Curated annotation (Swiss-Prot):
Enzyme class: hydrolase
Cited CDD domains: AP2Ec
Residues annotated for Zn(2+) 3 binding in this entry: H182, D229, H231
Organism for this UniProt entry: Chlorobaculum tepidum (strain ATCC 49652 / DSM 12025 / NBRC 103806 / TLS)
Keywords assigned: DNA damage, DNA repair, Endonuclease, Hydrolase, Metal-binding, Nuclease, Zinc
Protein name: Probable endonuclease 4
EC identifiers of the protein: 3.1.21.2
């Protein structure tokens, strides 16, 4: 089964995320576990944790279909000592929050060298950050999201993702989330079934399909290879609807979260229904 959902709001508490996902006909969802634009947040309460787990149970969401995202402030490749320690501490907290909620994955952007060090040094720093977080937690997989290639952010080439995974000690607790807009912006074509399949074969060759834990389904406002991260509603951007129809029929993409991050949240239920219209599910 294809597990399509969206990155839903946690307004009023994390326990509302599964309810918000259920309302739009989702079979998976993503969320933040706290305010993503602040370094510090109040700990999750026992009541919130219990309500979240109960709501997931009642709505039929299993942990493997939920892909929480960490704070945008975290940079696990930061070259400065004070900033990397702050980011690593925050990331461990994010992993612990996911663990407390009974979740098995945490999605993160790999990091940026800020033009202060070279790519490989930054990739080593990112991998060391992941290793430390895995040592400090149990049961949660760190899921690297590919990036669009903007600025000094790494993760826009499959080789970057492969290098991080190579350096992570516990290979059973690292994975990848492929964002379609980011793929397209960084130069990987998806516009036809043939182009999509070629890109997925390249991912399998360089990284390995066994590491694919989820996808973000977004069309792109800018052209192929633009390195501009601007999401568009499905079928209204430069990728086009054929790619997303193909994803829904692709046998390698079963039972992983396929998460919408398209600009119009009001249209998510319609987009989800449209995607399921490409299948018999």
């Amino acid at each position: 089964m294809k597990r399509v959902g969206a990155h839903v709001s946690i307004a009023g508490g994390v326990e509302n995320a599964p309810l918000n996902a259920q309302k739009i006909g989702a079979k998976a969802f993503a969320m933040f576990t706290r305010n993503q634009r602040q370094w510090h947040s109040a700990p999750l309460t026992a009541a919130s944790i219990e309500a979240f787990r109960r709501n997931c149970d009642e709505a039929g969401f299993l942990p493997e279909h939920i892909l929480p995202h960490d704070s945008y402030l975290i940079n696990l490749g930061a070259p400065e000592a004070d900033k990397i320690e702050k980011s690593r501490k925050a990331f461990v907290t994010e992993m612990q929050r996911a663990e407390a909620l009974g979740l098995t994955m945490l999605n993160f952007h790999p990091g940026s060298h800020l033009n202060l060090t070279d790519e490989d040094a930054c990739l080593k720093t990112i991998a060391e950050s992941v290793n430390r977080s895995l040592d400090a937690t149990a049961g949660v997989t760190a899921v690297i999201e590919n990036t669009a290639g903007q600025g000094s952010n790494l993760g826009w080439r499959f080789e970057h993702l492969a290098r991080i995974i190579e350096l992570v000690e516990d290979k059973s607790r690292v994975g990848v989330c492929l964002d379609t807009c980011h793929l397209f912006a960084s130069g990987y074509d998806l516009r036809t079934p043939e182009a999509f399949d070629a890109t997925l074969r390249e991912f399998d060759r360089v990284v390995g399909l066994l590491y694919l834990k989820g996808m973000h389904l977004n069309d792109a406002k800018q052209k192929l290879g633009s390195k501009v991260d601007r999401h568009e509603c499905l079928g209204k951007g430069m990728i086009g609807i054929d790619a997303f129809a193909h994803i829904m029929r692709h046998p390698a993409l079963e039972e992983i979260p396929l998460i919408l991050e398209t600009p119009n949240a009001e249209g998510w239920a319609e987009e989800i229904a449209m995607l399921y219209g490409f299948t018999n599910e």
